[in-house]
Amino acid sequence: TTDPDFDEWLKNVEDATGLNINVIAAPTDSDTRQQKVTTVLSTGDASIDIIEINDEMSASFKNSGWLEGLNDTVMTEDVRSQFAQGYLKNMITDKDGNIVGVPGYTGYLAFWVNQKIMDEVGITEINTKEDFMKYMEAASGDGRYGYGGSWEKTYAYNEIAQFVNMFGGDYFDWTKAENKEAIQFMKDMVDNNQTPIDQIADKYEQMNPKINDGKYGSFFMWGLGTDYEKAGMLGDDKIHMAMVPDFSGKGERAIVTDSRNYVLNSASKNKEAAIKF
């Protein structure tokens, strides 16, 4: 709802469906949003028919019985075949085989660099762990850091998972040595003043202004850089996406993905209209 084109999008949907759609903006704070949606669904609140949920909510809610199965109405076989089958099975199919979500968005946690800083310190590529470490050392100092992040408690897992993947670990198996190596690497960046410890309080709202101010030489971020574009900082000679480095040395590169799904509240009194939407 914060997108400047949202009102136009909503009008197009209403014109196409003939529906009168009342929109309630979700809380922007992730904890508050999770609590609100959980309360609505768990109490059988029928005031909201369709909710757009993220991956965390999908994992929490898919076996709760709070969401309507959509196999025979929206997510029919011809529609299901258009999506990655592993994603459908793992993220939006409940224990009884009911598909409870309609994918509406997917994105990825891309690696970004500040090209001005790279040029300044003479780093031409960040392809390996060794390249990354050289950049950290060269770019850090005088209030600037080679790497920046958003490590607030509800955000930190994104980058933890990303570094674990880059080292060839498994976020779901903490017996693996690669996982511990990744966490040690992140701690070493803090100890070496290559990334700031105070970012444990930062969400993206706090991180992005620092990026635009040239405080960070590299970082991971979702989306296409809208905040950087608005600040005049997006471009091949400024802030831009780059290939994620191969830390494992095995030629493997990995990124974290995310998604949003439309779900139908099983308590809804307007299921026919919701399915039309």
Language-model-detected regions and their locations in the chain:
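Extracytoplasmic/periplasmic substrate-recognition and gating elements
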Residues: 16, 25, 120, 192-194, ...
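Hinge/lid segment of periplasmic solute-binding proteins
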Residues: 55-109, 133, 159, 236-244
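Loop/turn elements at helix/coil->beta-strand transitions in domains of secreted/extracellular proteins
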Residues: 17-21, 44-49, 98, 140-145, ...
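Short glycine- and hydrophobic/aromatic-rich loop-to-beta-strand nucleating segment
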Residues: 109-113, 262-264
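Short helices/loops that flank or line small-molecule/ion binding pockets
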Residues: 34-46, 64, 117-118, 134-138, ...
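Beta->alpha turn/N-cap motifs
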Residues: 53-57, 204, 220-226, 259-260
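Glycine-centered hinge/linker elements that transmit conformational signals in sensory
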Residues: 133-140, 172-200, 244
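Conserved N-terminal structural module of periplasmic/extracytoplasmic solute-binding proteins
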Residues: 1-66, 76-81, 125, 233, ...
